[in-house]
A protein has these predicted regions:
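Acidic-and-aromatic substrate-binding clefts and catalytic sites of carbohydrate-active enzymes
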Residues: 51-58, 80-88, 111-117, 140-145
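Catalytic pocket-lining loop regions of alpha/beta-barrel enzymes
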Residues: 115-158
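Glycine-rich phosphate-binding "P-loop"
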Residues: 19-29, 101-117
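Metal-cofactor-binding active-site regions of metalloenzymes
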Residues: 44-51, 58, 65-83
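An N-terminally biased module of ancient metal coordination in phosphate/nucleic-acid-related enzymes
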Residues: 1-58
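Conserved, mostly hydrophobic/aromatic
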Residues: 7, 39, 63-66, 94, ...
Length: 158
């Protein structure tokens, strides 16, 4: 039986080359190679690699780099920015990225990150996801109602 981990994050150490947005209470690094070694150790065949928003925000370049190094092990998901008026183009470009299998919306209820569930940027994302046949992964800690409202408005979104 093939075993796929439905969500992993891998990341490089915080360096000027690829600086972190925040410094969480995580290990200093869990690189793509280290993730593959850990997966091998426990018998995981593949994983959905979600670019770590807390570290890299909307820059999924590290996820792309890791997927290219391990194309048979990782599929990738990119957080997208509801405030970007060109988010539809971002999603179209992402769809053409080898290994891309979805996009992510951050809908947590945290200071400075609250988002109104009727935000037009969320609607742009949902419409583009349907158009480009990309599933939407939502993080909605403490804000499940916002996620439900978005789903209700866009029932064709996966």
């Amino acid at each position: 039986m093939t075993i796929i981990d439905s969500q992993v994050h891998a990341y490089e150490a915080n360096t000027p080359k690829r600086p972190w947005h925040n410094v969480p209470n995580w290990p200093d690094h869990v690189t793509g190679d280290e993730m593959v070694a850990a997966m091998d150790k426990v018998g995981v065949d593949g994983a959905i690699f979600i670019s770590a928003f807390g570290l890299y925000r909307y820059d999924a370049s590290y996820a792309v780099q890791v997927q290219r190094a391990h194309p048979d092990r990782f599929a990738i998901v990119k957080p997208v920015d509801p405030d970007d008026s060109a988010v539809g183009d971002v999603i179209a470009d992402w769809k053409r990225t080898p290994g891309a299998v979805g996009i992510r919306i951050m809908l947590t209820k945290e200071p400075g990150r609250d988002r109104d569930p009727t935000d037009p940027g969320l609607d742009r994302i949902a419409r583009a996801a349907v158009k480009h046949d990309l599933p939407v992964n939502m993080l909605c800690w403490g804000n499940l109602d916002a996620g439900t409202a978005l789903i209700d408005r866009h029932p064709d979104t996966h």
